[in-house]
Amino acid sequence: MRYTRGAVWAGLAAVALAGTAGCGAQTTRAGEAVGRAGAIMAALGRATDRTDSLGSAEVRMSTELKGAAPIAMEGTYSWGDGYAYDVEMDTKAAKMETLTRSPSIRTLLVDGAYYYDTDPQPSGPLKGKEWMKVDASAVFGDKGAQALTGTSGAGSPAAIMRGLRYASDVRDLGRQTVDGKRATHYRAVIDKNHLGRAKEALASGDDTLFGSVTGGADSITMDVWVGAGDLPVRLKEVIGTMTVTMDFEKFGATADVKAPPAAQTGDVTELMKKAAARQ
């Protein structure tokens, strides 16, 4: 299964890394941030509270990795009771044609594990299986995965918004139109030393998929466009050599996301770890 590392990472990158800044950011910086830019932080605080309270959203997403074509995804995100998602992504862009003949591949995140709706394979751990499973530890390493999955909602859009409260160099870039909606554009930089437990993920070495693909990151640059009703219209994160952009189509009232039946699932976590270690 030499294809597994590159194929799975392309899909994971779009969502596994989005929002790492939001997990456990150190709250001791809140007072400093408000003192520096009270009006901006108040606006972001309102947007955070609104996003957090709604608990889910329908989204469209694009991930760009250096030297690769953008990967488009769309579906539902949920963060009301832990972080989960159910999305469809372009099979060809994600380089997963060897795993499914479908032009799009359904991808789930449930309880810190990623599931891909693949075609049953003739041999190996996916023989006769409908789903491929990859644990977050294969992406971020064991410590990084614990940091990201140990907090309710870690990695979700609401967590991203919370991280903005503790950023340095927060700027109001004015009113713009994005995705056909009028919104105020804010930009912030969060240093990894102010990410709390999430810095374990950013500290991942080259022996993890995160480190080998993004080159690691000392900070995250985040842009958010806040529109009507104090809700985000778009979020954008730059993490190392990766850029993730998320557009919100509708908030609230999405279906629960559940893991596939264990009998239909093949776990390739250890294969992914070994492949990353060989890079």
Question: Where are the language model's segments positioned?
Answer:
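Sec-dependent bacterial lipoprotein signal peptides
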Residues: M1-A21
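Subset-of-secretome marker
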Residues: R2-G6, C23-Q279
